[in-house]
Amino acid sequence: MATRNNFSLIALLTIRLRHLFIIPFAILLTFNGWTQSRQGFIPVNDGQLYYEKNGSGPPVIFLHGICLDHRMWQQQVDYFSKYYTCINIDLRGFGKSSLPGPATYSFHEDIKVLLDSLHTAEPVVLIALSMGGKAAVNFSLAYPKQTKALVLADAAIDGYHFKDFNLELVSNMAQQKGVDSAKQFFLNYSIFASAKNDTSVFKRLRKMILSYSGWQWLHKNPIVGLTPPAIEQLEQIKAPVLIITGEKDIWDFQQIADILHNNIKQSVKKQILDAGHMCNMEKPDVFNRLVSDFLINGE
C-alpha cells in the first residue's frame, strides 16, 4: 500500500459549477516529489529554440520579455508545474536559442513548430510578458484552434507605437558606445524602476540583461508579424484572455492593456499593486494567484 510519503493524490475541484471555465479540475499524481522534467533544442526554420518542459497536465507555454529569457518565469514554473505541463522557452535571438539569420522568421511560427515537435496536441495556455505578448497574440490569431487561453502581462502588441518607451535610444547607444554600455543604459530605463526596489528581483533581472547578446541592437531584425498587424485584429480573438498590469508600469503598457480589454470580448483586466513592468517577478505570489484563479474559474 502506498504511504503519504511516496504517493499523494491532489484533486483540485471547484464547487460552484457555474464558474467552471477553462480548467474545470486538475488531478496531480506525485511520487516521492518526482515530476517530469526535460530540456533541449527544437529545430526551427534557419535556427533552433531552447526549451524546458516540467510537470504534467494541460499545456502552458511561457513567453519572456525583450532582452530577457526563460529564467524570468522560474517562480511561475515552480508553482504551475504542480498542475500543468509547463513549457518555458527562449524566443529566437534570446537566451540559449539561436540568433536570427538572414531569412525572415516569426515568433508565432517558431512557437507552432516547437509545439508540434513536442507533440502538444491539445490547445495551450500562453502566458506572456512585454515582448512575449506580441508572440502570444499573434499565435492566437494565426492558430485560434490551438489557443486555450492567453495571459498577457504588461504586454506589447504589433502595431502599437510607443510614446514613452524608446528602444532606438538603446540601439544607438550600443552602436556608438558598445553593447556593454547599452546594457547599463537599458537597466536604468523607467520600466525597471520598480524592480530596483527589490534587491533580489533586480539582481535576477540584471543577470539576464547582462547575458543578453545585444544582437537586436546591432542588426536589422528580419522578424515578421501578421498582416494587418495584431492591433487591427484583436476583435477576432475568441479565447479567454487575462490582462495584467503592474500598477507602477509606464503609461504605454497601461494604454495597451486598455486597448486589449476594450477590443477582446472575452477578457478580464487585473492590476497588481505596488508592482511595475516585471510584475511576475516583483509580486510572484499575487501573479500566480491571479493566473490560477483565471485558469480555474475564469475570473
Model-assigned labels for residue ranges:
Residues 50-98:
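Conserved HGGG/HGGXW glycine-rich cap/lid loop of the alpha/beta-hydrolase fold
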Residues 237, 243-245:
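Short beta-strand/loop motif that positions the catalytic acidic residue
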Residues 250-256:
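Conserved alpha/beta-hydrolase "acid-adjacent" motif
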Residues 267-299:
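Catalytic active-site module of serine/aspartate enzymes centered on a nucleophile-bearing elbow/loop
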